[in-house]
């Protein structure tokens, strides 16, 4: 994919994510971004004397890998790769990249500063993938039983989903897929720490919209967001696409759900559900 087609500097390329290694890299990016930078996860999940940020990252990685793998295996997830990336280890250069997290080590690292943990985990992400946009065909849904370990670890996720569904007053027959290749579900985005501010998320999102319409032939994309920048990009798609903010609320303001408010305590983030129309209905 050329830089002229993507709007990226020449050293960066958009590629389809493939295989278990890309799934691991994507999972590491999303996990690291969530625990250290997310306006939700980094705020509401504080560490204790027995639970460090590193331990949270490892736990989230292990429980979220199924979701990431499902999306990568769909062939509908994209990533931005740095073609001039300088590998930190010879082994990484030989294999094209490698994740060095010690996922089997659950020993507490709470005596280390969060900044130290952040940088150590980042240094161990020795691969050229710098940004991801994960997605899957909504007609081939995720298995709820395989998501349960992630939900048990982060109960705010199913609570947020339930609150979003409660506020979605659309007629399902008007938008839901009745077969494969109709509605794409977006399921995660992240940019590697140190690569922010380059417009990767917007360029990758808009590229996915165009590819989903022209090549994959989807009629719509739905995305749930818990980040203002992501919400802004997806609610203002490039022509000829149009977007509808189907749901918008702040969990801390939900007077009817004390459990939801408690889970999001510490975060003032707005939650949105956005549907992008790629093609007019027949």
Where are the predicted features?
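Conserved N-terminal entry element of GNAT/NAT acetyltransferase domains
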Residues: 1-28, 32-39, 44, 95-112
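Active-site rim helix/loop that mediates acceptor-substrate recognition in acyltransferases
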Residues: 40-77, 81-120, 260-261
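An acidic- and aromatic-residue-enriched active-site/binding cleft used to recognize and process polar
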Residues: 83, 138, 189-191, 223-230
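Conserved acyl-donor/pantetheine-binding loop and adjacent beta-alpha core of acyl/acetyltransferases
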Residues: 86-192, 246-267
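Conserved GNAT acetyl-CoA-binding A-motif
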Residues: 182-185, 212-227
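Conserved acetyl-CoA-binding loop-helix of GNAT-fold acetyltransferases
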Residues: 186-212
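Accessory, usually C-terminal, subdomains that scaffold auxiliary metal cofactors
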Residues: 224-281
């Amino acid at each position: 994919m050329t830089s002229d087609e993507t709007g990226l500097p020449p050293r960066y390329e958009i590629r389809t994510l493939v295989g278990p290694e890309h799934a691991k890299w994507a999972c590491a990016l999303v996990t690291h971004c969530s625990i250290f930078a997310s306006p939700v996860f980094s705020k509401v999940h504080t560490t204790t004397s027995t639970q460090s940020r590193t331990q949270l990252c490892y736990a989230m990685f292990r429980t979220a890998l199924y979701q990431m793998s499902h999306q990568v295996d769909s062939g509908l997830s994209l990533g931005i790769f740095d073609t001039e990336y300088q590998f930190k280890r010879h082994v990484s250069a030989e294999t094209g990249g490698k994740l060095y997290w010690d996922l089997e080590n659950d020993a507490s690292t709470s005596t280390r500063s969060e900044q130290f943990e952040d940088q150590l985990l980042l240094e161990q992400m020795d691969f050229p993938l710098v940004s991801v946009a994960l997605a899957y065909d909504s007609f081939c849904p995720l298995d709820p039983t395989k998501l349960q370990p992630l939900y048990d670890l982060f109960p705010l996720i199913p609570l947020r989903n339930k609150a979003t569904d409660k506020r979605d007053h659309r007629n399902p027959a008007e938008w839901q897929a009745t077969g494969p290749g109709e509605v794409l579900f977006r399921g995660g985005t992240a940019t590697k720490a140190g690569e922010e501010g380059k417009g990767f998320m917007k360029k990758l999102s808009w590229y996915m919209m165009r590819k989903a319409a022209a090549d994959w032939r989807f009629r719509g994309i739905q995305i749930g967001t818990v980040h203002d920048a992501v919400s802004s990009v997806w609610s203002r798609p490039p022509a000829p696409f149009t977007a509808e903010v189907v749901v918008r609320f702040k969990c801390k303001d939900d007077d009817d759900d004390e459990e939801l408010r408690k889970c999001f305590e510490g975060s003032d983030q707005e939650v949105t559900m956005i549907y992008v129309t790629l093609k007019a209905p027949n």
